[in-house]
């Protein structure tokens, strides 16, 4: 379960980073 939480956290951070990059580019 721990690795699932880690993957979930990484996914959220990656999603936020992607959104931030898109907003910056646009």
Curated annotation (Swiss-Prot):
InterPro entries: Dermaseptin_dom. It holds the Pfam family DD_K. The modification Valine amide is found at residue 26. Coiled coil: none annotated. It comes from Phasmahyla jandaia (Jandaia leaf frog). Has antimicrobial activity. Transmembrane segments: none annotated. The lineage of its organism: Eukaryota, Metazoa, Chordata, Craniata, Vertebrata. This is Dermaseptin-J4. Its main location: secreted. It is found in: Secreted. GO terms for biological process: defense response to bacterium. Expressed by the skin glands. Keywords: Amidation, Amphibian defense peptide, Antibiotic, Antimicrobial, Secreted. One of its GO terms (cellular component) is extracellular region. Belongs to the frog skin active peptide (FSAP) family. Dermaseptin subfamily.
